[in-house]
From Swiss-Prot:
It is an enzyme of class 2 (transferase). The chain crosses the membrane at residues 22-42, 102-122. Belongs to the diacylglycerol acyltransferase family. GO terms for molecular function: O-acyltransferase activity. CDD domains: LPLAT_MGAT-like (cd07987). This is Diacylglycerol O-acyltransferase 2-like protein 6. GO terms for biological process: lipid metabolic process. It is found in: Endoplasmic reticulum membrane. Diglyceride acyltransferase that uses fatty acyl-CoA as substrate. Particularly active with oleate as a substrate. Has no wax synthase activity to produce wax esters. It comes from Bos taurus. The keyword Transmembrane helix applies.
Protein backbone atom coordinates (compact mmCIF):
# COMPACT_ATOMS: atom_id res chain seq x y z
CA UNK A 1 0.00 0.00 0.00
CA UNK A 2 3.02 2.27 0.30
CA UNK A 3 3.02 2.45 -3.49
CA UNK A 4 -0.56 3.76 -3.55
CA UNK A 5 -0.01 6.25 -0.74
CA UNK A 6 2.85 7.98 -2.57
CA UNK A 7 1.03 8.51 -5.85
CA UNK A 8 -2.12 10.23 -7.01
CA UNK A 9 -4.60 8.43 -9.23
CA UNK A 10 -3.18 9.83 -12.49
CA UNK A 11 0.33 8.69 -11.62
CA UNK A 12 -0.94 5.25 -10.67
CA UNK A 13 -2.73 4.84 -14.00
CA UNK A 14 0.29 6.12 -15.92
CA UNK A 15 2.60 3.70 -14.13
CA UNK A 16 0.27 0.74 -14.67
CA UNK A 17 -0.14 1.59 -18.37
CA UNK A 18 3.62 1.30 -18.88
CA UNK A 19 3.98 -1.66 -16.54
CA UNK A 20 1.56 -3.77 -18.61
CA UNK A 21 3.15 -3.02 -21.98
CA UNK A 22 5.69 -5.84 -22.32
CA UNK A 23 4.07 -8.46 -20.01
CA UNK A 24 0.85 -8.36 -22.03
CA UNK A 25 2.72 -9.73 -25.08
CA UNK A 26 4.13 -12.55 -22.95
CA UNK A 27 0.70 -13.31 -21.50
CA UNK A 28 -1.09 -13.23 -24.86
CA UNK A 29 1.65 -15.33 -26.42
CA UNK A 30 1.55 -17.91 -23.64
CA UNK A 31 -2.18 -18.55 -24.09
CA UNK A 32 -2.00 -20.19 -27.56
CA UNK A 33 1.43 -21.74 -26.96
CA UNK A 34 0.10 -23.57 -23.87
CA UNK A 35 -3.61 -23.95 -24.60
CA UNK A 36 -3.48 -25.16 -28.22
CA UNK A 37 -1.23 -28.20 -27.53
CA UNK A 38 -3.07 -28.94 -24.26
CA UNK A 39 -6.51 -28.93 -25.87
CA UNK A 40 -5.20 -30.91 -28.82
CA UNK A 41 -3.67 -33.73 -26.78
CA UNK A 42 -5.30 -33.86 -23.35
CA UNK A 43 -8.93 -32.76 -23.71
CA UNK A 44 -12.02 -33.43 -25.79
CA UNK A 45 -11.86 -29.86 -27.09
CA UNK A 46 -9.19 -30.74 -29.65
CA UNK A 47 -11.33 -29.18 -32.37
CA UNK A 48 -10.71 -25.73 -30.83
CA UNK A 49 -6.99 -26.19 -31.43
CA UNK A 50 -7.57 -27.45 -34.96
CA UNK A 51 -9.75 -24.45 -35.80
CA UNK A 52 -7.20 -22.03 -34.33
CA UNK A 53 -4.40 -23.55 -36.40
CA UNK A 54 -6.61 -23.67 -39.50
CA UNK A 55 -7.41 -19.98 -39.12
CA UNK A 56 -3.71 -19.16 -38.74
CA UNK A 57 -2.94 -21.06 -41.95
CA UNK A 58 -5.85 -19.46 -43.83
CA UNK A 59 -4.95 -15.97 -42.65
CA UNK A 60 -1.19 -16.41 -42.96
CA UNK A 61 -0.55 -13.66 -45.52
CA UNK A 62 -2.68 -10.96 -43.91
CA UNK A 63 0.10 -9.50 -41.77
CA UNK A 64 2.23 -9.04 -44.90
CA UNK A 65 -0.59 -7.25 -46.73
CA UNK A 66 -1.43 -4.41 -44.39
CA UNK A 67 -2.99 -6.43 -41.59
CA UNK A 68 -6.23 -5.47 -39.82
CA UNK A 69 -5.74 -2.14 -38.11
CA UNK A 70 -8.33 -0.92 -35.63
CA UNK A 71 -8.96 2.76 -34.96
CA UNK A 72 -10.57 1.68 -31.68
CA UNK A 73 -7.42 -0.05 -30.42
CA UNK A 74 -5.16 2.76 -31.61
CA UNK A 75 -7.28 5.21 -29.60
CA UNK A 76 -7.48 3.26 -26.34
CA UNK A 77 -7.37 5.50 -23.27
CA UNK A 78 -4.51 3.43 -21.84
CA UNK A 79 -2.17 4.84 -24.49
CA UNK A 80 -2.90 8.37 -23.27
CA UNK A 81 -1.76 7.41 -19.78
CA UNK A 82 1.28 5.74 -21.37
CA UNK A 83 2.11 8.94 -23.25
CA UNK A 84 1.75 11.16 -20.19
CA UNK A 85 4.02 8.93 -18.09
CA UNK A 86 7.11 10.28 -19.89
CA UNK A 87 5.56 12.44 -21.60
CA UNK A 88 5.89 11.64 -25.33
CA UNK A 89 5.43 14.17 -28.13
CA UNK A 90 5.33 14.05 -31.95
CA UNK A 91 6.72 17.03 -33.89
CA UNK A 92 6.31 17.69 -37.62
CA UNK A 93 8.84 19.80 -39.51
CA UNK A 94 7.41 19.29 -43.03
CA UNK A 95 4.15 18.09 -44.52
CA UNK A 96 3.89 14.60 -46.02
CA UNK A 97 1.80 14.60 -49.18
CA UNK A 98 -0.79 11.79 -49.45
CA UNK A 99 0.22 11.48 -53.11
CA UNK A 100 3.39 9.60 -52.15
CA UNK A 101 4.46 6.66 -50.02
CA UNK A 102 7.17 6.94 -47.39
CA UNK A 103 9.72 5.05 -45.35
CA UNK A 104 10.13 6.84 -42.03
CA UNK A 105 13.45 5.75 -40.54
CA UNK A 106 13.29 5.92 -36.75
CA UNK A 107 16.38 6.62 -34.62
CA UNK A 108 17.55 5.68 -32.06
CA UNK A 109 16.03 2.33 -31.16
CA UNK A 110 16.40 2.83 -27.42
CA UNK A 111 16.46 -0.04 -24.95
CA UNK A 112 12.74 -0.19 -25.77
CA UNK A 113 11.23 2.05 -28.49
CA UNK A 114 8.61 3.83 -26.39
CA UNK A 115 8.46 6.96 -28.55
CA UNK A 116 8.25 5.06 -31.82
CA UNK A 117 5.42 2.90 -30.49
CA UNK A 118 3.25 5.66 -29.05
CA UNK A 119 3.74 8.11 -31.93
CA UNK A 120 3.21 5.69 -34.81
CA UNK A 121 1.33 2.62 -33.49
CA UNK A 122 -1.29 4.63 -31.60
CA UNK A 123 -3.19 7.86 -32.22
CA UNK A 124 -2.42 9.29 -28.79
CA UNK A 125 -0.12 12.03 -30.05
CA UNK A 126 -2.37 12.78 -33.02
CA UNK A 127 -0.55 11.28 -36.00
CA UNK A 128 -3.66 11.41 -38.23
CA UNK A 129 -4.20 15.06 -37.32
CA UNK A 130 -0.54 16.05 -37.77
CA UNK A 131 -0.10 14.09 -41.01
CA UNK A 132 -3.56 14.02 -42.64
CA UNK A 133 -4.01 11.41 -45.35
CA UNK A 134 -1.04 9.32 -44.21
CA UNK A 135 -1.46 5.79 -42.82
CA UNK A 136 1.47 4.66 -40.62
CA UNK A 137 2.71 1.09 -40.28
CA UNK A 138 5.37 0.17 -37.72
CA UNK A 139 7.66 -2.62 -38.93
CA UNK A 140 8.95 -5.23 -36.49
CA UNK A 141 10.26 -8.82 -36.35
CA UNK A 142 8.17 -11.25 -38.39
CA UNK A 143 8.31 -13.95 -35.71
CA UNK A 144 5.73 -12.04 -33.67
CA UNK A 145 3.15 -12.80 -36.37
CA UNK A 146 3.59 -16.55 -36.01
CA UNK A 147 1.84 -16.49 -32.62
CA UNK A 148 -1.99 -16.54 -32.57
CA UNK A 149 -3.66 -13.75 -30.56
CA UNK A 150 -0.42 -11.75 -30.43
CA UNK A 151 -0.53 -11.27 -34.21
CA UNK A 152 -4.12 -10.00 -33.99
CA UNK A 153 -3.17 -7.59 -31.22
CA UNK A 154 -0.20 -6.05 -33.02
CA UNK A 155 -1.97 -5.95 -36.39
CA UNK A 156 -4.77 -3.94 -34.79
CA UNK A 157 -2.24 -1.18 -34.09
CA UNK A 158 -0.91 -1.10 -37.63
CA UNK A 159 2.21 -3.16 -37.01
CA UNK A 160 3.67 -5.15 -39.91
CA UNK A 161 6.69 -7.42 -40.49
CA UNK A 162 9.98 -5.78 -41.44
CA UNK A 163 10.25 -8.16 -44.38
CA UNK A 164 10.87 -7.27 -48.00
CA UNK A 165 7.56 -8.88 -48.99
CA UNK A 166 5.51 -6.82 -46.53
CA UNK A 167 7.34 -3.55 -47.17
CA UNK A 168 7.04 -3.77 -50.94
CA UNK A 169 3.36 -4.69 -50.71
CA UNK A 170 2.56 -1.65 -48.58
CA UNK A 171 4.65 0.69 -50.71
CA UNK A 172 3.49 -0.48 -54.15
CA UNK A 173 0.13 -2.29 -53.87
CA UNK A 174 -1.87 -0.31 -51.28
CA UNK A 175 -2.14 2.94 -53.18
CA UNK A 176 -0.51 6.13 -51.90
CA UNK A 177 -0.38 7.81 -48.52
CA UNK A 178 1.30 4.91 -46.71
CA UNK A 179 4.26 5.40 -44.36
CA UNK A 180 6.25 2.43 -43.09
CA UNK A 181 8.23 3.17 -39.93
CA UNK A 182 11.48 1.20 -39.73
CA UNK A 183 13.83 1.17 -36.73
CA UNK A 184 16.92 0.98 -38.92
CA UNK A 185 19.39 0.21 -36.14
CA UNK A 186 17.26 -2.67 -34.90
CA UNK A 187 17.92 -4.56 -31.72
CA UNK A 188 21.68 -4.31 -32.22
CA UNK A 189 21.40 -0.55 -31.77
CA UNK A 190 19.66 -1.07 -28.43
CA UNK A 191 23.00 -2.22 -27.00
CA UNK A 192 24.41 1.26 -27.78
CA UNK A 193 21.63 3.13 -26.03
CA UNK A 194 22.84 4.74 -22.80
CA UNK A 195 21.83 8.03 -21.17
CA UNK A 196 23.72 10.81 -22.91
CA UNK A 197 24.52 8.65 -25.95
CA UNK A 198 23.58 9.84 -29.43
CA UNK A 199 24.90 6.92 -31.44
CA UNK A 200 23.00 5.31 -34.30
CA UNK A 201 23.79 2.15 -36.22
CA UNK A 202 23.49 3.26 -39.83
CA UNK A 203 26.70 3.12 -41.90
CA UNK A 204 26.13 -0.43 -43.11
CA UNK A 205 22.34 -0.40 -42.86
CA UNK A 206 21.39 0.16 -46.49
CA UNK A 207 18.52 -2.26 -47.02
CA UNK A 208 15.87 0.38 -46.31
CA UNK A 209 17.43 2.65 -48.96
CA UNK A 210 17.35 -0.16 -51.52
CA UNK A 211 13.67 -0.83 -50.78
CA UNK A 212 12.96 2.90 -51.13
CA UNK A 213 14.61 2.92 -54.56
CA UNK A 214 12.81 -0.23 -55.71
CA UNK A 215 9.43 1.19 -54.67
CA UNK A 216 9.95 4.92 -55.18
CA UNK A 217 9.06 5.61 -51.55
CA UNK A 218 10.38 8.89 -50.16
CA UNK A 219 12.81 8.58 -47.25
CA UNK A 220 11.96 10.52 -44.09
CA UNK A 221 14.41 10.86 -41.17
CA UNK A 222 13.07 10.91 -37.63
CA UNK A 223 14.87 11.20 -34.30
CA UNK A 224 13.40 10.54 -30.85
CA UNK A 225 15.17 12.90 -28.47
CA UNK A 226 15.16 11.49 -24.94
CA UNK A 227 14.60 7.86 -25.94
CA UNK A 228 18.07 6.89 -24.69
CA UNK A 229 17.54 8.60 -21.33
CA UNK A 230 14.77 6.45 -19.89
CA UNK A 231 16.87 3.42 -18.88
CA UNK A 232 20.34 2.87 -17.47
CA UNK A 233 22.11 0.05 -19.27
CA UNK A 234 24.80 -2.08 -17.66
CA UNK A 235 27.76 -3.18 -19.77
CA UNK A 236 30.21 -4.94 -17.49
CA UNK A 237 33.99 -4.42 -17.96
CA UNK A 238 35.70 -6.68 -20.48
CA UNK A 239 37.63 -9.52 -18.87
CA UNK A 240 35.30 -9.91 -15.90
CA UNK A 241 33.16 -12.98 -15.26
CA UNK A 242 30.04 -10.79 -15.34
CA UNK A 243 30.88 -9.61 -18.84
CA UNK A 244 31.62 -13.19 -19.94
CA UNK A 245 28.17 -14.42 -18.91
CA UNK A 246 26.47 -11.26 -20.17
CA UNK A 247 28.01 -11.61 -23.62
CA UNK A 248 27.38 -15.36 -23.74
CA UNK A 249 23.69 -14.82 -22.95
CA UNK A 250 23.37 -12.00 -25.48
CA UNK A 251 25.10 -14.00 -28.23
CA UNK A 252 22.99 -17.10 -27.55
CA UNK A 253 19.67 -15.24 -27.63
CA UNK A 254 20.76 -13.33 -30.72
CA UNK A 255 21.54 -16.60 -32.50
CA UNK A 256 18.43 -18.50 -31.39
CA UNK A 257 15.77 -15.78 -31.31
CA UNK A 258 17.36 -12.92 -33.26
CA UNK A 259 16.91 -10.75 -30.17
CA UNK A 260 19.45 -8.32 -28.73
CA UNK A 261 18.98 -8.45 -24.97
CA UNK A 262 20.10 -5.50 -22.85
CA UNK A 263 21.00 -5.57 -19.17
CA UNK A 264 19.13 -2.51 -17.99
CA UNK A 265 17.30 -0.96 -15.08
CA UNK A 266 15.20 2.11 -14.37
CA UNK A 267 12.76 3.17 -11.68
CA UNK A 268 10.35 1.11 -9.62
CA UNK A 269 6.67 1.60 -8.91
CA UNK A 270 7.46 4.91 -7.22
CA UNK A 271 9.75 7.70 -8.39
CA UNK A 272 13.21 7.32 -6.93
CA UNK A 273 12.90 3.58 -6.35
CA UNK A 274 14.87 0.93 -8.24
CA UNK A 275 13.23 -1.27 -10.83
CA UNK A 276 12.78 -1.94 -14.53
CA UNK A 277 10.22 0.70 -15.45
CA UNK A 278 11.53 3.59 -17.57
CA UNK A 279 12.40 6.88 -15.92
CA UNK A 280 9.93 9.75 -16.35
CA UNK A 281 11.83 11.65 -19.01
CA UNK A 282 10.34 13.50 -22.01
CA UNK A 283 10.64 11.80 -25.40
CA UNK A 284 10.11 13.97 -28.47
CA UNK A 285 10.02 12.36 -31.91
CA UNK A 286 10.87 14.89 -34.61
CA UNK A 287 9.90 13.89 -38.16
CA UNK A 288 12.05 15.56 -40.79
CA UNK A 289 11.80 16.58 -44.42
CA UNK A 290 11.01 13.84 -46.96
CA UNK A 291 13.84 13.00 -49.34
CA UNK A 292 12.48 12.34 -52.87
CA UNK A 293 13.63 8.97 -54.22
CA UNK A 294 13.38 7.83 -57.84
CA UNK A 295 11.90 4.42 -58.56
CA UNK A 296 14.55 2.09 -59.97
CA UNK A 297 13.68 -1.56 -60.52
CA UNK A 298 17.19 -2.87 -59.88
CA UNK A 299 19.33 -0.15 -58.28
CA UNK A 300 23.07 -0.80 -58.39
CA UNK A 301 25.37 -0.45 -55.40
CA UNK A 302 26.56 2.99 -56.46
CA UNK A 303 23.01 4.33 -56.57
CA UNK A 304 22.16 2.83 -53.17
CA UNK A 305 25.31 4.38 -51.69
CA UNK A 306 24.43 7.76 -53.18
CA UNK A 307 20.98 7.93 -51.60
CA UNK A 308 22.23 6.38 -48.38
CA UNK A 309 24.71 9.27 -48.10
CA UNK A 310 21.94 11.78 -48.83
CA UNK A 311 19.82 10.20 -46.11
CA UNK A 312 22.66 10.40 -43.58
CA UNK A 313 23.07 14.09 -44.38
CA UNK A 314 19.33 14.65 -43.89
CA UNK A 315 19.37 12.87 -40.53
CA UNK A 316 22.44 14.81 -39.42
CA UNK A 317 20.74 18.08 -40.36
CA UNK A 318 17.57 17.14 -38.49
CA UNK A 319 19.55 16.25 -35.37
CA UNK A 320 21.65 19.42 -35.41
CA UNK A 321 18.65 21.71 -35.95
CA UNK A 322 16.68 20.34 -32.98
CA UNK A 323 19.18 18.99 -30.44
CA UNK A 324 19.41 22.12 -28.28
CA UNK A 325 15.64 22.59 -28.20
CA UNK A 326 15.18 19.07 -26.83
CA UNK A 327 17.78 19.01 -24.10
CA UNK A 328 21.17 18.42 -25.72
CA UNK A 329 24.13 20.77 -25.77
CA UNK A 330 25.24 22.69 -28.83
CA UNK A 331 28.44 20.61 -28.91
CA UNK A 332 26.66 17.23 -28.77
CA UNK A 333 27.30 15.30 -31.98
CA UNK A 334 25.38 12.53 -33.67
CA UNK A 335 27.69 9.52 -33.93
CA UNK A 336 26.97 7.26 -36.89
CA UNK A 337 28.59 3.83 -36.91
Amino acid sequence: MAFLSQLNLQEILQTLSVLQWMPVYVFLGAIPIIVIPYFLVFTKFWMVSVLALAWLAYDWNTHSQGGRRSAWVRNWTIWKYFQNYFPIKLVKTHDLSPRHNYIIASHPHGVLPYGTFINFATETTGFARIFPGITPYVATLEGIFWIPIVREYVMSMGVCPVSELALKYLLTQKGSGNAVVIMVGGGAEALLCHPGATTVLLKQRKGFVKVALETGAYLVPSYSFGQNEVHNQETFPEGTWKRFFQKALQDTLKKLLRLSVCTFHGRGLTRGSWGFLPFNHPITTVVGEPLPIPRIKKPNEETVDKYHALYINALQKLFDEHKVQYGLSETQELTII
